Amino acid sequence: MIDKQKQKLNMKVQWAKFAVVLALYLLFLVWVESWLGLIVVPFIFDVYITKKIHWQWWKDEEGPVRFIMSWVDALVFALVAVYFINLFFFQNYVIPSSSLEKSLLTGDYLFVSKVSYGPRIPETPLTMPLTQHTMPLVNVKSYIEWPHWDYRRVKGLGNVKLNDIVVFNYPAGDTLVNEERYQANDYYQMVYSIGDQLMQQNGQEKDVRAMSPLQQRHYFEQVYATGRNYISSMPGEYGDIISRPTDRRENYVKRCVGLPGQTLQIKNRIVYLNGKANKEPDNVQYTYKMKLKGEFPIDLADELGITNEDLLMYNQSGVIPLTKKAYLVLKANRKLVESISINTDATYGDLYPLNAYTGWTRDNYGPVWIPKKGESIALTLKNLPVYERCIKVYEGNDLKVDNAGRIFINGKQAKSYTFKLDYYWMMGDNRHNSADSRYWGFVPEDHIVGKPIFIWWSHSPDHPGFSGIRWNRLFTFVGNIK
C-alpha cells in the first residue's frame, strides 16, 4: 500500500516536472518562431513519463563503463547547455586589442547579451561549443557547413542605438588565407597591397587620380587579380584561400557611430551625421607626435592609463595614443615633454573602398550614406565601389559592369538598387589605432552578435598576477561608459 502511494506520488511529481519543462520549451519555440522543435516533445514526454527509452542505461553497468559514461553524460549535457545559452542568451567576450581604449581596455572580459538585439538563428548550427571557427590544438574547422540556414533574427529587447558598443562578426572575414601567420590579416587589403607592389615592380603602376571612374575600375580589377594570383601561386607561404560563413567569422567590438539611413562624414576627426556633429566618447584617443626630454616615468604612465603597448608605439614611431586628459597633463609637464602635437599625417592607403580613389583620409572621410533596408540609391560608377560589396557579398547579387560602363545586377541593367538589409558604421574609440569601418566598410545587420552589458573580469596584460586585476572595473556596466 505504501509502495503504491509512493509510486503514485512520484508520478504526480514527474507529471509536474513534465508540465513545467514542456511549458518552458513551448514558450521558447514561440519566441524563436520555429515549430520544427515540436518533434522533440515526444522525447521530453518519454524522459519524464513513459520511459520507454533507457536513457541512462550505463547506470546498470559495473566497472569502467559506468565511470566513463557518467563523465561522458555530464560532458555532453554541459556542452549542449553551453551551446544553447551562448547561442540564444549570452556569451563571454574578451577585449583582445586596444581599438576601444580608453573606454574598454585590453583584458576586459565582457558579458555579451544576445537578447538585447535579438539572437540570430544559427547559419551553421552544427558547431563545437566554445569555439568560433577552429578546434584548438588540431587546428581544423570546428563547424560543418551543412545544413546552412538563411539569416533570421529572433525578436529582442530593442535595436542597435547610436553610440552603442556592439559585438559583431568581422565583415571582411568572409575570405582569408588559412596559413596561421596571415589569418589575422585583412585578406582584401593584403591582396590589393601585394598587387600594387607587383605592378610597381613591373612598371605598370598608374596615377589613378587622373582616371575616369570606369578607368579606375579596370585598373583596380587588374591590381586585385595580380595580388590574388600571386597569393594563389604561393600555397607554401599563404596556404589555401578559404571562406567562412557569417556566424563563424571573428568577433569584433566597436562603437556604433552611424545608423541605417544616416549620412556620415568625418571632418577634422569629428563624426558628423546628417550634418550634425556626433558627441565624441569621453575617453576618445588620438595619436600625438611627442618629443621627451628623458625617460617616460612608469608611475605617470599608470596614472594616465598609458600602456606598454602605447609606449612601444612611441619608442618605434615617435607617436603615442592619448586621451584629451592625458594630452593636457603631458602638455603642461614642461620638465618631461619638449613638444607635443596631434598627429595629422594623411593616410590614404587601405581605406574603404579599396577599389577606388576617393582622396579620403582617416580624419577626413566621406560623406557616405549608410544603407537602410527598403530604401533605394541611384547607382553610378562613382558611388558603386562604396556599395558594391553590400550588393554582391552581403545581399548575394551578381553584379557586373560592361565596357561601356553600364551596371548589371542579376543580368539586368540597373540604375538604382533597393537594399534588403540595414547597415551600421562602427568605429573604435582609439581613433588613430583602430581597424574599423573606415577600412572595411559597413556592418550588415546579419553580422550583429550582441550588446556588452557589463565587465565581469578585468586584468591588465602589463601587470602579471594579482597586481594586474583592475578592481575598479569589475561589474562596471558598459552602458555607463560613454
Show the residue positions of the predicted features:
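Extended hydrophobic leader/signal-anchor segments used for secretion and membrane insertion
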Residues: M1-K482
